[in-house]
Amino acid sequence: ILSDMRALAPDCIVADSMAIWGKLIAQKLGIPFVSSTTTFAFNRYSAGMMKQSPVRFLRMLCSMPKIGREIKRLQAAGYSVKNVLDIIQNDDSTDTIVYTSPEFQPYSDTFSADHYAFVGPSVRPAETRMEKPRQPLVYISLGTVVNDHPSFYRQCIAALADSPCRVILSVGEQVSPADLGALSQNVEAHSQVDQIAVLQVADVFLTHCGMNSVNEALYFGVPLVMFPQTPEQGGVCTRVLQLGAGVKLEKPDAV
């Protein structure tokens, strides 16, 4: 990559915050770098919101020797890396674009206004148009990655069957709607839907708390019922709770 970048001779590199090689190569070439951050900006203050389970923490500790070896390899190649935090943590000297608002970003006042731009989410137009139903609309989705939870979907279906609500489930590609059993007349299940179109008319969104989904729901003013699946999603959930924009399901059977 470094040889390719030298041949390209860019004036600036803009890279996702998780594409750590972008920042390292910019430093190596002595050119400006801009970090593009699609999650919350991460520093020692906001880190506490990304709560790790004991199992995840143990896995992280077990991986530390390998991380240490990789850092030493980078240092030997002339890259300026002190420790793992240099790689994963935002700093006050890097120009950074964050795709959320300062109101939603935890501890936004601890990030340098000279280097951080909280520009808000970029919400695309809906591909289709939905009419607002007469009855309240409940939208349920666990996103596109960690969504293989047919038992959870069945619990939602059972809880909301024959209720005075219309229910739309987006179950992803890992679960077939046909495997969810018989649906009552007020419930429909799909592998995917136009989420923007649904959120424009939804009254409640049961979500996994992915950053994109939450940003879109907040944009359209839809209250959230949250069922986070990962530490990052747990951090988003915590922030939504702090702002009073949603409630959390503590257990799957709490639906």
Per-region residue spans from a language model:
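Nucleotide-sugar-dependent glycosyltransferase catalytic domains
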Residues: I1-L137, G143-C165
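Nucleotide-activated sugar donor-binding and catalytic core shared by glycosyltransferases
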Residues: A7, C12, V34, A47-T100, ...
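A generic "binding-loop/recognition-motif" signal
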Residues: M18-A19, E173-Q174, D194, G210
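Residues in the short beta-alpha loop(s) of Rossmann-like NAD(P)-binding domains
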Residues: T39, E173, T230
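Short glycine/serine/threonine-biased micro-segments
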Residues: F118, S141, S170, H208, ...
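Short loop/edge segments at beta-strand edges and connector loops
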Residues: G120, V171, S191
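Short, flexible micro-motifs
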Residues: V123, V146, V175, N212-S213, ...
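Catalytic donor nucleotide-activated moiety binding site of glycosyltransferases and closely related
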Residues: T144, R154-E188
